A protein has these predicted regions:
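Short, polar/charged alpha-helical segment
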Residues: 50-72, 409
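Short, well-ordered beta-strand elements
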Residues: 38-50, 71-76, 99-100, 149, ...
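Hinge/lid segment of periplasmic solute-binding proteins
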Residues: 104-162, 185, 201, 209-214, ...
Length: 443
């Protein structure tokens, strides 16, 4: 009997031990399952969007993260485009490198030459992804020798913005904005009075590039650096001279307001009635319409008389994949990029920011049509882009020293207000930028 009881006790103990062991194994398996469920591929995304733009971007990222369970995109603000590029230089190729990075359009040549990026063309080819759904006049900028290097994201172009109320007061038709230089000069004369000016351009190199390209003028040789390595500038021909002469003449006639280099100052001057017409980015149209205490009109970039309109170059930025990161992360980033370019996401992006939709199908969605009914000015910006002819001029120039070049142009523009002859100012900028190009070749 005692033996039987002892056996029973031992058996009970063993059962108890086995029961606890099974429970432990079960819990461990559950924990592993949970870990497998929550483990996602992380995509660190560096960007330069701030304020309302960052809010709109974060909404897109949050929606993507919630739409699937395998990828987690982490947006990280890195300051201005220039600041972000400086930080990229410090970490590219290291474990601290992001997977995805937003870089401004003039950084294209630099990024390609860095050797640290993976062209999105790789994933386009592997998947047979249809890029015809993307706006060709935007994609063209980031296409070099048939390879699409980055995915267009926030793109804009320049437009003429004008005060319709001021037009009426001056006896001008508010529905017929100036389309040529002679019309611009004539309208500016009628609009200039009582300390208020007819026209202004921000002292910013981008606007010079645009006024050059709309005429078909090239910024540098070798077909704007698209056929081969650019070795010297080409902007100091008749097209560039026309731009400088326009500014010089209007300033000396007293119809042009020197607004400086600050975007906020420029927009504030327009809203206060200091000038009746100026050039701005298409991305700023809605904000201007909302904040101006008068009716705002938007039109195409004016061109010289008797010159055929070629179109505009896109500005803004694109998304770049890093080369030296895990393939899994690159594929995850590509999934996010595809999501971003869907019509639904692009429609929301266009409505919330004013940037163009990379996927034009977005313009057919109700959310955009409703926005255009409220802001018909946005349609003008889209139409100007659609009507742009694909040429080396409108593709934009490819040079690695673009930031420096822009500053040289700014200095040249400012010298016009000091009485420097337009041709002399243009040649001085050309010589300085040619030296920069020569130095870049030696690095």
């Amino acid at each position: 009997m005692k033996k039987w009881i002892s056996t029973l006790l031992i058996a009970s103990t063993l059962v108890g031990c086995n029961s606890g062991s099974d429970e432990t194994v079960s819990k461990t398996n559950d924990q592993k399952g949970e870990e497998q469920q929550v483990q996602k591929t992380e995509v660190v995304f560096w960007h330069a969007m701030s304020g309302d733009l960052e809010k709109a971007l974060n909404e897109i990222v949050a929606d993507f993260n919630a739409s699937q369970s395998t990828i987690e995109v982490k947006p990280v603000f890195q300051g201005t485009y220039e600041e972000a590029l400086t930080k990229f230089n410090a970490v590219a190729g290291t474990k601290d490198s992001p997977t995805l990075m937003q870089t401004f359009e003039i950084g294209t040549k630099y990024m390609i030459e860095s050797g640290k990026i993976e062209p999105v063309q790789k994933f386009i080819d592997e998947e047979g992804y249809d890029v015809s759904q993307w706006e060709k006049n935007i994609v063209n900028y980031y296409t070099v020798n048939g390879t699409i290097y980055s995915m267009p994201f926030n793109s804009s172009t320049p437009v003429l913005i004008y005060n319709k109320d001021a037009f009426k007061e001056a006896g001008l038709d508010p529905e017929k904005p100036p389309m040529t230089y002679s019309e611009l000069k004539a309208a500016a004369k009628q609009l200039t009075k009582d300390g208020k000016y007819g026209f202004s351009i921000l002292n910013y190199g981008w606007f010079f590039e645009q006024m050059l390209a709309v005429q078909g003028g090239l910024y540098v040789n070798e077909e704007n650096g698209r056929k081969g390595e650019a070795t010297e500038v080409a902007f100091n021909g008749k097209e560039g001279l026309r731009v400088f002469e326009l500014i010089y003449d209007m300033y000396n006639e007293g119809t042009f307001y020197n607004v400086g280099q600050n975007w906020d100052d420029m927009r504030a001057a327009f809203q206060s009635g200091k000038m009746a017409m100026y050039l701005d980015s298409s991305a700023g149209v809605r904000t201007i319409v909302d904040s101006a205490p008068f009716q705002v009109g938007v039109s195409y970039l004016p061109i010289p008389d008797d010159v055929e309109r070629q179109g505009v170059i896109i500005g803004g930025a694109s998304l770049w994949l890093m080369k030296d990161v895990d393939e899994e992360k690159k594929k995850a980033a590509w999934e996010f990029m595809k999501y971003v370019t869907t019509p639904e996401v692009q429609a929301k992006w266009h409505v919330n920011t004013g940037y163009f939709a990379v996927n034009p199908s977005a313009y057919d969605l109700p959310i955009v049509k409703e926005q255009w009914e409220k802001y018909p000015q946005l349609m003008v910006t889209v139409n100007q882009l659609k009507e742009t002819k694909a040429t080396p001029a409108t593709q934009g120039a490819l040079i690695s020293i673009f930031p420096q070049a822009r500053q040289k142009i700014v200095s040249a523009m400012e010298s016009l207000y000091q009485g420097v002859d337009p041709k002399e100012a243009l040649e001085r900028a050309a010589n300085e930028i040619n030296r920069e190009l020569e130095m870049a070749k030696k690095r």
